[in-house]
Amino acid sequence: LIAMITQIGYAIGLLFIVPLGDLFQRKKIIIINFSLLILSLLTIAMAPSINVILGASLVTGICSMVPQIFIPIASQFSRPEHKGRNVGIVVSGLLTGILASRVVSGLVGEIFGWREMYYIAAVLMLLCSVVVMKVLPDIQPNFQGKYSELMKSLFSLLKTYPQVRLYPIRAGLCFGSFLTLWSCLAFKMGQAPFHAGSNIIGMLGLCGIAGALSASLV
């Protein structure tokens, strides 16, 4: 249930928060989302009940769309001949982080407990926000208008370009298959006859890192 709520939040963030990068400065959006992530992660770490965890997980999912803001930034600051490679590097980092985090969280959860992993994640988000404030330049928005007009323009793209309708379906099926595999695999490995702990289950993430690293080469 927690994983499902988090993914619902992620979808909400992709649909309603990522487009704000064309309306407001992306640096501010990223820092605000990092701040909310820190609060939500600390809330989960100190949560007294499952309902609090579910609510904070929804916020965590919504704010976890930050990497999707970095992808157009990488494209914007790249030379035309290097755009594909640089975007691929960012995507590789995103996918590698998803898989490597399973390994790290599994080990930390097994040794110290799951709450400690959320404390560590909050500290890492704080470090990331500091790096963004120091390194990322101010990028002026390129859309002049209201948020409602911005959202309408997105739907007009769906009507105008068939590729824009096709690519999200393909990506959604691929990512859905990916999440289904890894989510179910964790439960299966924890049951008979394996009875694996979170550290062993997390190690399975190493199997997919090689494929994630190859994204920059495809």
Short names for language-model regions:
Residues 52, 89-134:
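Helix-loop-helix hairpin linking two adjacent transmembrane segments in secondary transporters
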Residues 56-92:
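Cytoplasmic helix-loop-helix junction between adjacent transmembrane helices
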Residues 58, 160-180:
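Pair of pore-lining "gating" transmembrane helices in MFS-fold secondary transporters
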